[in-house]
Amino acid sequence: MKRIAFVFSTAPHGTAAGREGLDALLATSALTDDLAVFFIADGVFQLLPGQKPDAVLARDYIATFKLLGLYDIEQCWVCAASLRERGLDPQTPFVVEATPLEADALRRELANYDVILRF
C-alpha cells in the first residue's frame, strides 16, 4: 500500500478544510497504518487547545485530534518555523503530540510519502 501524508496548512474554523481533513485521516487509518500527519503554516493552529469555535458558529472538531493515538496514528510532525512565525512555542501543550521539525527536515520527511493530501 502507498504511504499517505496528510498536510494541514489552513487555520481551523475559517473553512471546513481542517474538519474534512481530519475526517479523511481517520477514515484512511482504517485502510492503512502507513500514514503521517504534518502541520505547516496556519495549520499549526489546529494543534491549539481551548479554542472557542462556537463563537463563530463552527463545530468543535479540534478535540477529535486527541483520538489519533486510538487510531494508531503516531507519526505527527509540526513545522518549527511555522510555530516561530506565529509566536508559538514548541513546548506548548498541543492537543496531539507532534514532533517539531525545521523546514528542510520536514520537506525530506514529506518526500518519503507516495500520496500527499493537503487540507
From Swiss-Prot:
Species for this entry: Escherichia coli (strain K12)
Compartment(s): Cytoplasm
Keywords: Cytoplasm, tRNA processing
GO terms under biological process: tRNA wobble position uridine thiolation
InterPro entries: DsrEFH-like (IPR027396), Sulphur_relay_DsrE/F-like (IPR003787), Sulphur_relay_TusC (IPR037450), Sulphur_relay_TusC/DsrF (IPR017462)
Highest taxon, organism lineage: Bacteria
Recorded GO CC terms: sulfurtransferase complex
Gene3D superfamilies, sorted: DsrEFH-like (3.40.1260.10)
Protein name per its UniProtKB record: Protein TusC
Bilayer-spanning residue ranges: none
